[in-house]
Structures are given as structure tokens and as C-alpha cells.
């Protein structure tokens, strides 16, 4: 089981930002990633629907690759489905919100923290609850930024148009005197430059992907699941969307040249499968 891959899932390509950190911290681990681009965005969908999608993807990854752990590299899916998945799967399941919230608490100096995310993540209130549980004196300002997900998926990251959209989405945070901003959607680190420009250098950006990768290391070590290999691990990619679009962004973002993604039809996810 130690040689089995770590599974990662997202609504699109944003979860590659988490995969990048996992590969950096665990270079010998095998990984398999599925981006559900055909059903993007998850943000406006109901908790029940996002949970169903998450279950389908987990089942697919377990059937295809016998994953030893699942990283829900999507804030919306973490908010909706993490507890359910942890209760139903016989493998470790790691989400991105708790690690991101803890990183924000450790980063802030004035305890005024901004959170940018999808509508679903903001509505769940999970970041606010997790931050306040660790630091009750914090003030949290949350903003839903669905247009920024679209920018990332379209690989529109550094244009004047992208900067304008980001600035408009973050405008309501400008008078809140935050010193820390959580990028509470795994797509948003792709827009780091535009986000930093919009909020100014006095605001520290928190990427939950790094903290999530660190938690993944700790959990695998505790469970005795770390791969003992000394060679670089393999990486498989699946998408329910256009493979060319996925491959372009994956090759730009990841440190190593990725293998081409394989297309997965939605019917393959919705058809019941046997999982050993």
C-alpha cells in the first residue's frame, strides 16, 4: 500500500497548485489527479450535489489507481464533503480549509484576515469558524470571487483584463485593514501576482496548498504510508474537460513536465463501480 498513489481531486485545474506542493514535499510519491472541469464551477452548486460529485471522483480514483489517501484539493468540496468522506472512506482524507485557516492564524499580526473563495465556500462559513476556533479575537472578512475562477480556467492570469477583474473582486476588502489574505480557492494562487498587486505588498497572501501538503506528509507518516522509494514518483492526470486546455496549464504550473491528461466522461463517474 505504501507504493499506491496519493489521489487529488478538484473542480478544475486549481488543485494543481496543491499537487505542486505535494510533489515538492514528497517527490518520491506517486500521484493521480482528477480535475472535474466539465462540471465546473462547484461554487454555486448545493452541498448535496458537490458531495455527490466528490463521492463519484473518490470512487473513480480508488477503482482506477487504488489510492492510499485522498486530498480534496478544492475548498468548495472540502466545505461540503470532507466530513462525509472521512466517515465513509477507509483511507485518510485531507481537506484544504483547516490547514489554510491555521496558516492564516500563524501569519496575521493584527488579527484582521481576509478570505477570498467561491460562493459555496463563503456560504459554508468554514474558514471563519476554523479561524475563530484557533484565534477567537480575529476579525474575518470573506468575499466570493467566482469570476476569478473563470480567469484561472481560461489561463487569463496576467493580462490587463485579469488585473481589472481581480481588483474589482477585491475592492470591498480595501478599507478593512487586513494584513493577511487567504486564497481560499485552489485556483487563486495561479492569480497570485494580480492579487498581490490589488491588495498591496503590506498584505501577506496565504496559500492553503502548502499547509495542506504539510498535513498530508504528517498523516502519511503517522499511518506508515510514506513511499520508501528513492526515485521520483509518477503522476497521472485525468480531466472531465478538454485535455489540451488542461495540459497547457499543467505544463506551465507544475515543476516537472506532466504526462498528458486522459479524458474521463461524466458517464464513467456516474456509473457504479466495484472498489476493492
Swiss-Prot record:
The active site is at residues 74, 185. PROSITE patterns: ASP_GLU_RACEMASE_1, ASP_GLU_RACEMASE_2. Its EC number is 5.1.1.3. SUPFAM superfamilies: Aspartate/glutamate racemase. GO terms for molecular function: glutamate racemase activity. Pathway: Cell wall biogenesis; peptidoglycan biosynthesis. It holds the Pfam family Asp_Glu_race. Gene3D superfamilies: 3.40.50.1860. One of its GO terms (biological process) is regulation of cell shape. Keywords: Cell shape, Cell wall biogenesis/degradation, Isomerase, Peptidoglycan synthesis. Substrate binds at residues 10-11, 42-43, 75-76, 186-187. It catalyses: L-glutamate = D-glutamate. InterPro entries: Asp/Glu/hydantoin_racemase, Asp/Glu_race, Asp/Glu_racemase_AS_1, Asp/Glu_racemase_AS_2, Glu_race. It is an enzyme of class 5 (isomerase). PANTHER family: GLUTAMATE RACEMASE. NCBIfam families: glut_race. Provides the (R)-glutamate required for cell wall biosynthesis. Belongs to the aspartate/glutamate racemases family. This is Glutamate racemase. It comes from Levilactobacillus brevis. The lineage of its organism: Bacteria, Bacillati, Bacillota, Bacilli, Lactobacillales. The gene is murI.
Amino acid at each position: 500500500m505504501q507504493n499506491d498513489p496519493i489521489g487529488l481531486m478538484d473542480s478544475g485545474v486549481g488543485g494543481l497548485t496543491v499537487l505542486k506542493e505535494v510533489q515538492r514535499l514528497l517527490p518520491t510519491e506517486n500521484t493521480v489527479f482528477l480535475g472535474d472541469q466539465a462540471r465546473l464551477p462547484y461554487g454555486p452548486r448545493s452541498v448535496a450535489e458537490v458531495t455527490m460529485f466528490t463521492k463519484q471522483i473518490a470512487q473513480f480514483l480508488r477503482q482506477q489507481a487504488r489510492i492510499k489517501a485522498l486530498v480534496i484539493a478544492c475548498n468548495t468540496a472540502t466545505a461540503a464533503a470532507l466530513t462525509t468522506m472521512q466517515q465513509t472512506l477507509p483511507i485518510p482524507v485531507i481537506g484544504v480549509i483547516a490547514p489554510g485557516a491555521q496558516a492564516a492564524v500563524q501569519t496575521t499580526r493584527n488579527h484582521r484576515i481576509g478570505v477570498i473563495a467561491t460562493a459555496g465556500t463563503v456560504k459554508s462559513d468554514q474558514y471563519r469558524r476554523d479561524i475563530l476556533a484557533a484565534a477567537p479575537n480575529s476579525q474575518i472578512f470573506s468575499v466570493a470571487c467566482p469570476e476569478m475562477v473563470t480567469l484561472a480556467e481560461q489561463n487569463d492570469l496576467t493580462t490587463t483584463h485579469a488585473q481589472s477583474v481581480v481588483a474589482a473582486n477585491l475592492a470591498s476588502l480595501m478599507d478593512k485593514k487586513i494584513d493577511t489574505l487567504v486564497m481560499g480557492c485552489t485556483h487563486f494562487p495561479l492569480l497570485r501576482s494580480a492579487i498581490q498587486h490589488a491588495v498591496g505588498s503590506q498584505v501577506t497572501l496565504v496559500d492553503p496548498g502548502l499547509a495542506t501538503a504539510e498535513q498530508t506528509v504528517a498523516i502519511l507518516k503517522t499511518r506508515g504510508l510514506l513511499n520508501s522509494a528513492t526515485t521520483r514518483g509518477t503522476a497521472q492526470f485525468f480531466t472531465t474537460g478538454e485535455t489540451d486546455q488542461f495540459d497547457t496549464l499543467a505544463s506551465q504550473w507544475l515543476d516537472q513536465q506532466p504526462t498528458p491528461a486522459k479524458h474521463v466522461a461524466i458517464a464513467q463517474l456516474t456509473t457504479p463501480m466495484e472498489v476493492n
